[in-house]
Amino acid sequence: MSLAKVKHIVLVLSGKGGVGKSSVTTQLALSLSLAGHSVGVLDVDLTGPSIPRMFGIEDAKVTQAPGGWLPITVHEADPSAGVGSLRVMSLGFLLPKRGDAVVWRGPKKTAMVRQFLSDVFWDETDYLLIDTPPGTSDEHISLAENLLQKARPGQLAGAVVVTTPQAVATADVRKELNFCTKTNIRVLGVVENMCGFVCPNCSECTNIFMSGGGEVMANDFGVRFLGRVPIDPQFLVLIETGKRPTYPAGTTVDGKDISTPAGASTSEEEEVKDGSRLVHKYKDCSLAPIFSKITADVISAVQQ
């Protein structure tokens, strides 16, 4: 396998579509990089590969090396800033056109997943995050079989399971937790995503759906609850346009003031969607301290 230089493999799973799994994968990757770790992201959501867009690199082209592919570099390591490298591989880079549909039957999907695991040349990587499609489909079964058979002992660290608070979501995500049990994949924890909405004017967080469903589910299964993540429009603006997040005076997260300084100006460079600068802009996002804690808990769970 081409995973020889990868220390820890973490799956990001959800039994329900639309819960923000790729958003969670993206922010876990950025947070791990900000913690100084070298990170890889493998996108095996074959029919809906959204990871290239999340990192602002959807126009990148994969380099074919003898015997396989070289992943796309989002940014190189910056030891002086304590930032680790970040690389990405996705089927989205291999499609002739961005809007092309992937109409494959199960055997072809299985073969593609197997090829992604064996033919992508990852350099020294502390954490490889594998973003999966929703449900328990052919991709999941192929991933589980190949990783459990071929990964080194302890290399497959486990899975982070993503849900939203509503019962209609947790009912399906419970099936994903059962899938992990049946395939002997350790659950590192549950993230409750979209648990509230951060107002762009006053930054007050309102529970527009409900709250607590993910924590109840985690407790029912006896797994770690990693935390709640609200919807922040500034994160969406960052991903879609590349603009650095800004917040009104008095905005705090976990007691820390993240207000944008009065009179702060934004250069033209800061307004450009550039994947290589994403990690530095993300530090100003209200979700960054939340994911910093979630990431620390994931690392702790991996090392246990």
Swiss-Prot record:
<comment type="similarity">
    <text>Belongs to the Mrp/NBP35 ATP-binding proteins family. NUBP2/CFD1 subfamily.</text>
</comment>
<dbReference type="GO" id="GO:0051539">
    <property type="term" value="F:4 iron, 4 sulfur cluster binding"/>
</dbReference>
<dbReference type="InterPro" id="IPR033756">
    <property type="entry name" value="YlxH/NBP35"/>
</dbReference>
<keyword id="KW-0411">Iron-sulfur</keyword>
<dbReference type="InterPro" id="IPR028600">
    <property type="entry name" value="NUBP2/Cfd1_eukaryotes"/>
</dbReference>
<keyword id="KW-0479">Metal-binding</keyword>
<keyword id="KW-0963">Cytoplasm</keyword>
<feature type="binding site">
    <location>
        <position position="199"/>
    </location>
    <ligand>
        <name>[4Fe-4S] cluster</name>
    </ligand>
</feature>
<dbReference type="GO" id="GO:0005524">
    <property type="term" value="F:ATP binding"/>
</dbReference>
<dbReference type="GO" id="GO:1904564">
    <property type="term" value="C:cytosolic [4Fe-4S] assembly scaffold complex"/>
</dbReference>
<feature type="binding site">
    <location>
        <position position="202"/>
    </location>
    <ligand>
        <name>[4Fe-4S] cluster</name>
    </ligand>
</feature>
<dbReference type="Pfam" id="PF10609">
    <property type="entry name" value="ParA"/>
</dbReference>
<dbReference type="GO" id="GO:0002098">
    <property type="term" value="P:tRNA wobble uridine modification"/>
</dbReference>
<dbReference type="GO" id="GO:0051536">
    <property type="term" value="F:iron-sulfur cluster binding"/>
</dbReference>
<protein>
    <recommendedName>
        <fullName>Cytosolic Fe-S cluster assembly factor cfd1</fullName>
    </recommendedName>
</protein>
<comment type="subunit">
    <text>Heterotetramer of 2 NBP35 and 2 CFD1 chains.</text>
</comment>
<dbReference type="InterPro" id="IPR019591">
    <property type="entry name" value="Mrp/NBP35_ATP-bd"/>
</dbReference>
<keyword id="KW-0067">ATP-binding</keyword>
<keyword id="KW-0004">4Fe-4S</keyword>
<feature type="binding site">
    <location>
        <begin position="15"/>
        <end position="22"/>
    </location>
    <ligand>
        <name>ATP</name>
    </ligand>
</feature>
<dbReference type="GO" id="GO:0016887">
    <property type="term" value="F:ATP hydrolysis activity"/>
</dbReference>
<feature type="region of interest" description="Disordered">
    <location>
        <begin position="249"/>
        <end position="271"/>
    </location>
</feature>
<dbReference type="GO" id="GO:0140663">
    <property type="term" value="F:ATP-dependent FeS chaperone activity"/>
</dbReference>
<dbReference type="InterPro" id="IPR027417">
    <property type="entry name" value="P-loop_NTPase"/>
</dbReference>
<keyword id="KW-0408">Iron</keyword>
<comment type="function">
    <text>Component of the cytosolic iron-sulfur (Fe/S) protein assembly (CIA) machinery. Required for maturation of extramitochondrial Fe-S proteins. The NBP35-CFD1 heterotetramer forms a Fe-S scaffold complex, mediating the de novo assembly of an Fe-S cluster and its transfer to target apoproteins.</text>
</comment>
<dbReference type="GO" id="GO:0005829">
    <property type="term" value="C:cytosol"/>
</dbReference>
<dbReference type="GO" id="GO:0046872">
    <property type="term" value="F:metal ion binding"/>
</dbReference>
<keyword id="KW-0547">Nucleotide-binding</keyword>
<dbReference type="GO" id="GO:0016226">
    <property type="term" value="P:iron-sulfur cluster assembly"/>
</dbReference>
